Amino acid sequence: MVDVNRLRSRMVLMGYNQRTLVAEMNARGVKTSENTFSSKMTGKSQFDCDDADVICDILEVEEPAEKAAIFLV
């Protein structure tokens, strides 16, 4: 499960919305769609390790504790 509020706040802080984050993920080799991303944000499916790694890289989440707080709730 993901802490959606924490992830969304980090997205806003870094200047991303769902569409732009998905586009950047695709540019970095993690192929996903906005619908798939939305399903993961609503808990219908889960982010995998590749997703989490790329999202953390894009959003400049470097601290392991912060990564865990977002993706290991």
For the regions a language model picked out, list residue spans one by one.
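A short, Lys/Arg-rich alpha-helix, primarily the initiator
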Residues: 1-18, 22-24
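Helix-turn-helix DNA-binding elements, focusing on the entry/boundary residues of the two helices
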Residues: 18, 34, 52
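Key DNA-contacting residues within the recognition helix of helix-turn-helix
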Residues: 22, 38, 67-68
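A short, basic/aromatic helix-end/turn motif that makes direct DNA contacts
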Residues: 24-27, 59-61
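Recognition helix of helix-turn-helix/homeodomain-like DNA-binding domains
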Residues: 27-46
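Short, basic-rich loop-to-helix N-cap that marks the start of a DNA-contacting helix
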Residues: 43-57
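Short C-terminal boundary/hinge segments that cap the last helix of small helical domains
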Residues: 49, 59-73
